[in-house]
Amino acid sequence: MEAFYGILIPFLGTSLGAACVFFLRKTLSDAVQRALTGFAAGVMMAASVWSLLIPAIAQSAALGRWSFLPAVLGFWAGILFLLALDHIIPHLHAKSGQAEGPKSRLQRTTMMVLAVTLHNIPEGMAVGVVYAGYLSGQAQITAAGALALSLGIAIQNFPEGAIISLPLRAEGMKKSRAFLDGVLSGVVEPIGAVLTILAARHVIPALPYLLSFAAGAMLYVVVEELIPEMSQGTHTNVGTIFFAIGFSLMMVLDVALG
């Protein structure tokens, strides 16, 4: 049951964030959006290092001086996987006027939801692979450590849910539909987590590769999407400060609970 609740916590964060559309009349200011984006980037980067890459290297200690190899290979596989999805799936970031990926006749709002969904895929995989390690009895991964990752991602999912539902509302969509689209953008997380758990439990020796794969995928999102969004235009210092806050919070959660 711990794993079941653990994989639902991040989805709950997205849903609660999307519910902001019922309580906030206006879209978020640039300063607030940069702060939330920076915070999310900090949490994801810290989670990639403390919750994924370091355990991946620790689990490969039997390889001696080559213990870094599974982490490096998995990391690059995750980067390339997200790079491929970025080119295959048509999507549109909220602050961008130009769609990415192949040409499509999809509505602007649909492509905005796809952008956040693409972002959520590695987060679901990260939670799934950590809980797979815990369920398989890996000494480096504890129930508290897995919970710390779930909580950290849920905290940064809250503003992400708001960032998708509020702009949709601002573009004329009904509140209920904007909320539903915000929620649906996070559905991929528990689905990805469950699929990752099922796959990882059958290939336990590959767990270091899967941990670092999730880290690579998450860091791709941070560098390709979040850091540019928090660094463009005005209020860039706000994004940087909240990046540090998010990183520190996730680091504290992982060390204190792990």
Describe these PLM feature segments.
Residues 1-258:
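Intrinsically disordered, metal-sensing/regulatory segments
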